[in-house]
Amino acid sequence: MREIYKKIVLNVDGQERTFRLKKLDAFSGAQLLQLMRKYLPGAEREAEKENGKVRVADLVEPVFMALSPGELKELMMTALGHTEVQLEAGYQKVMEMGEWGWPELEHDAGSCLRITLESVLWSLEGFFGGAGSRSRPEESM
């Protein structure tokens, strides 16, 4: 199975850290859409349009704000479960099977939300644009 990654850099505890996001497969992406579907129509009405198309980034924030605490936790756990942090010895999973694999993020809500937002935007960008994903894999295995 091919895995597609995207790297992002975040400041965690005063240190720049590189995170590797694994793109959601088609089934997980569809589940993500199913989770968010009830909030999309309202967000789409409020989002600004660029060249007649709604920008995905403008949709995600209002959807995040509308999610119930349980839905937000489910979304974050999915995104963090598809994320690794680059350490000196190699990549370490951020979360595995609902447990923190890299506990430095456990109390860093801002970084966890940013990772979740980046993951959602990247995984859904092709859906709203009407074409396939525009992201190019930085690394595939």
Enumerate the language-model features and the residues they cover.
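Short, proline-centered helix/strand-breaking motifs
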Residues: 21-25
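Short acidic, Pro/Gly- and aromatic-enriched capping/linker segments at domain boundaries
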Residues: 1-11
